């Protein structure tokens, strides 16, 4: 699903009040001093999926994205098996809610399968985001954009898309 489609689906007309209390986004947000809605917004843009064919989209924990295609595993067990098969060929794979890239961030974990644990995945995503904010303390869009890419033509576009999703969700967050 494209980022523009996610931004469209998370419009004022479609958004309803929601709470992140008790979620991994709430827990990690408190631990990392990051707004949980921002973490959720990044996860929504990174792994957003609509498994039930409704108008709702949500971060999905068992997404694996290779350079060729995204894989939406139905279960954690399936995701583990698919990830193991992918890693036999390449470490160019993004994993889980926050789409942590094994090639660039594999050093942060003992085993790539650890990234299928939602809490671990969001914690690593928060660490990456905090590192970006430390590099760009006065430019949130740049810091958020660098979460996804360091290619200048993609950074601002991604950062602005996440910021629009964040701003919309923040207005509806309890």
Question: What are the residue ranges of the model-derived segments?
Answer:
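Catalytic glycan-binding domains that act on GlcNAc-containing polysaccharides
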Residues: 14-174
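N-terminal signal peptide c-region/cleavage motif recognized by signal peptidases
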Residues: 10-12
